[in-house]
């Protein structure tokens, strides 16, 4: 039995697609020194190579892939987008705008200088910024530009070619910039991180172990009563001194939950709740009374829940104002835009932030009702909301706007991005609406992106040889410029205009580039996870701005002088 692989792949689009994805994902696992190629570039390289052999794929698959990807980007950005845009994220918004705006202007200037078309120029911008949202936004706007005519296919091929040529340049140059740029300025990052840690009263260490609180029971002896000196629990402030709080007291056989006015007496049995290291550091006055085993006293269900910040009495407040420990709860982590934040009493809470809180089930439920709601523990996606907002996004994308003789459409990219942001925002406000497990969202977003990359690579592969010799060196040099110059501009703007702390500034710069590998290097250099505060501040807004930049560069290109 003879099998003609070429005919088999050409006759079966689905098989070809998954062969490209499988080979590309394998290639993406390879590392060049400290740099991993990544899934996007792996799939793109394989699809370009197969495209050279005249394999092709249905363009509808390409369209569906980019639609799924950009919609999921909007859903992820939605919970924090408006709070960053309108509230305390002004500096972060301005940094992201400077980064994206300067890169777009440089790309436009270089494209005109070298005489490229819009496809190469937009592709170079996307690759240099290592930003698939730019690629997606530009590709969608190209398809909806009637004036392209017969040039449309060529420009689409050049779009993916420009991206493929400059992606690794953008990634490697940013990683080296993240490693060496902090050393060229006067303030070192560890010192800046420690300064923020001292000002805000948090641990600057980037590694933090999280434990569940445990409960132990002790009998109150004369030493503890003498130490209390007749003060009630409110006056004693036991949590501030020990890291534990008194959950229950048994006195004369009666079990009760104490209020702040209770005074400890000899013979009381108290249940203390705290982290294991807090118990190990307890003052000897507690241990002089014997530890006791009392089934009823120790009968407390410790739970850990993820609470989504929603209510007005929590949004805009500092973490310290929640007084979680006063309510018998322990904060394990804070997540914003899928980025884990340092636990910082000065962090201002945004709508959609997720707090992981441990404590007695009743107390955690009470805290959740006060600040928002407990995130649904479900693996079931609200497909109705997902599909309905997807349809809304496509409908919004059909809207056209006319200025004098100039007409342009909003396009599917902007429409779906808007619809995704709205779905994410509504999800952050209504616990039972539009739920999408993070794993499912990641899978759909990644799959959509890989399908899109496979489509553009197969489409452009047939023209890569003829185009590469003409623009290769120019493209690589331009990619290096567009990758690094905006980073320098952004640093100068943040350091000397906004006067930001350097650790926060470098984190915010990497967030504006949406580059996680570079962010890891910044955290290592700072020996702290404090730069994550800045990274989370710019990440969500940068994803949106990058998508819009991809569309905008195509729209304004014809209006620029040749």
Curated annotation (Swiss-Prot):
Q: Which SUPFAM superfamilies match?
A: TrkA C-terminal domain-like (SSF116726)
Q: Say yes or no: keyword Transmembrane helix present.
A: yes
Entry's transmembrane regions: 8-28, 32-52, 66-86, 93-113, 116-136, 158-178, 383-403, 406-426, 447-467, 478-498, 537-557
- Extract the Gene3D superfamilies matched here: Regulator of K+ conductance, C-terminal domain
Give the subcellular location. Cell membrane
Q: Record's Gene Ontology CC terms? A: plasma membrane
Q: Which UniProt keywords apply?
A: Cell membrane, Membrane, Repeat, Transmembrane, Transmembrane helix, Transport
Positions the record marks as coiled coil are none
One of the entry's Gene Ontology molecular-function terms is: monoatomic cation transmembrane transporter activity
Does the record's keyword annotation contain Cell membrane?
yes
* Membrane-related topology note: Multi-pass membrane protein
Listed GO biological process terms: potassium ion transport
Q: Identify the domain of life.
A: Bacteria
**InterPro entries (alphabetical):** AAE_transporter, RCK_C, RCK_C_sf, Transp_YbjL_put, YidE_YbjL
Pfam family of this protein, just one?
Answer: TrkA_C
**Where is the RCK C-terminal domain positioned along the sequence?**
202-288, 292-373
* NCBIfam families xrefs: PRK04972.1 (NF003440), YidE_YbjL_dupl (TIGR01625)
> To which protein family does this belong?
Belongs to the AAE transporter (TC 2.A.81) family. YbjL subfamily.
UniProt-listed HAMAP family: YbjL (MF_01015)
What protein is this chain from? Putative transport protein PC1_1686
Give the source species. Pectobacterium carotovorum subsp. carotovorum (strain PC1)
């Amino acid at each position: 039995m003879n099998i003609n692989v070429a005919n088999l792949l050409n006759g079966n689009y689905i098989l070809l697609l998954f062969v490209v994805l499988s080979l590309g994902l394998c290639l993406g696992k390879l590392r060049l020194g400290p740099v991993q190629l990544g899934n996007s570039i792996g799939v793109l390289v394989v699809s370009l190579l197969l495209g050279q052999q005249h394999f092709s794929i249905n363009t509808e698959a390409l369209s569906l892939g980019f639609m799924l990807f950009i919609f999921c980007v909007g859903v992820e950005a939605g919970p924090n987008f408006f709070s960053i845009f309108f509230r305390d994220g002004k500096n972060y918004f301005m940094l992201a705008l400077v980064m994206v705006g300067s890169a777009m202007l440089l790309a436009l200037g270089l494209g005109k200088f070298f005489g490229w078309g819009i496809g190469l120029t937009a592709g170079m911008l996307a690759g240099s910024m290592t930003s698939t949202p730019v690629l997606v936004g530009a590709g969608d706007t190209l398809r909806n530009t009637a004036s392209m005519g017969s040039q449309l296919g060529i420009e689409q091929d050049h779009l993916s070619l420009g991206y493929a040529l400059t992606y690794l340049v953008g990634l490697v140059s940013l990683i080296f910039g993240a490693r060496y740029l902090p050393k060229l300025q006067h303030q070192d990052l560890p010192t800046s991180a420690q300064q923020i840690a001292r000002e805000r009263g948090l641990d600057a260490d980037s590694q933090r172990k999280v434990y569940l609180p445990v409960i132990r029971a002790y009998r109150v002896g004369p030493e503890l009563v003498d130490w209390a000196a007749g003060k009630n629990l409110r006056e004693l402030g036991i949590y501030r001194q020990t890291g534990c709080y008194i959950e229950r007291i048994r006195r004369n056989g009666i079990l009760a939950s104490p209020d702040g006015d209770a005074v400890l007496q000899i013979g009381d049995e108290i249940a203390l709740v705290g982290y294991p290291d807090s118990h190990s550091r307890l003052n000897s006055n507690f241990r002089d009374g014997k530890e006791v085993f009392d089934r009823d006293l120790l009968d407390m269900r410790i739970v850990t829940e993820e609470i989504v910040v929603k209510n007005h009495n929590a949004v805009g407040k500092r973490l310290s104002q929640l007084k979680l420990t006063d309510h018998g709860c322990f904060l394990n982590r804070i997540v914003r835009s899928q980025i884990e934040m340092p636990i910082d009493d000065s962090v201002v809470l945004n709508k959609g932030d997720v707090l992981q809180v441990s404590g007695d089930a009743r107390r955690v439920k009470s805290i959740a009702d006060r600040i928002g709601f407990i995130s649904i523990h479900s693996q079931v996606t609200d497909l109705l909301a997902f599909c309905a907002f997807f349809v809304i996004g496509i409908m919004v994308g059909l809207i056209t706007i006319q200025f004098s003789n100039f007409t342009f459409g909003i396009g599917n990219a902007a429409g779906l991005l808007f619809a995704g942001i709205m779905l994410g925002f509504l999800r952050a406000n209504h616990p039972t609406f539009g739920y999408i497990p993070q794993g499912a969202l990641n899978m759909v977003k990644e799959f959509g992106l890989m399908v899109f990359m496979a489509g553009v690579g197969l489409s452009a592969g047939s023209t890569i040889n003829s185009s590469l010799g003409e623009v290769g060196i120019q493209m690589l040099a331009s990619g290096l410029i567009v990758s690094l110059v905006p980073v320098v501009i952004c640093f100068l703007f943040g350091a000397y205009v906004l006067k930001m702390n350097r650790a926060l500034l470098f984190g915010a710069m990497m967030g504006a580039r949406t580059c996680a590998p570079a962010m890891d290097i910044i955290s290592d250099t700072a020996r702290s996870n404090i730069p994550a505060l800045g990274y989370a501040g710019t990440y969500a807004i940068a994803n949106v701005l990058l998508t819009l930049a991809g569309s905008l560069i195509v729209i304004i290109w014809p209006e620029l002088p040749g």
